[in-house]
């Protein structure tokens, strides 16, 4: 299952979460996102990591393109985002 893994700095986590992520300007469900996870650094609560899970690689690639276009907008107000498509090879609960 392909996952789009994103990392970036935000000015303020709570504001970013409410006004950017929760507002969902990219239409996650319509774009094929099946699940998301948000994490942040314990040392820097404004450094976020997001994982968007898809059924297919083409869906993940299309979302990657949408996000690159969104990040070009100065209103995005996020610092140097990085994103890559990964695949989960193993997960086990203990």
What are these regions (language model features)?
Residues 21-25, 55, 62, 79-80:
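Amphipathic alpha-helical interaction segments
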Residues 12-35, 68-74:
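Short amphipathic alpha-helical segments
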Residues 16-18, 60-62, 93:
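Short acidic, gly/pro-rich beta-turn/loop elements at beta-sheet edges
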Residues 1-11, 55-57, 71, 75-87:
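Long, low-complexity, intrinsically disordered polar/charged segments
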Residues 31-49, 72-94:
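Glycine-rich beta-strand-turn "strand-cap" elements at beta-sheet edges
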Residues 6, 21-23, 50-52, 58, ...:
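Intrinsic disorder/low-complexity signal
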Residues 2-9, 37-66:
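Short, well-ordered beta-strand segments in beta-rich or mixed alpha/beta enzyme
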């Amino acid at each position: 299952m392909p996952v789009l893994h994103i990392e970036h700095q935000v000015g303020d986590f709570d504001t970013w979460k409410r006004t950017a992520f929760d507002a969902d300007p990219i239409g996650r469900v319509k774009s094929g996102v099946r699940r998301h996870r948000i994490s942040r650094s314990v040392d820097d609560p404004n450094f976020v990591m997001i994982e968007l899970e898809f059924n297919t690689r083409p869906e993940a690639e299309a979302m990657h393109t949408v996000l690159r276009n969104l990040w070009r907008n100065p209103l995005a107000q996020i610092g140097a985002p990085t994103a890559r498509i990964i695949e989960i090879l193993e997960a086990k609960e203990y």
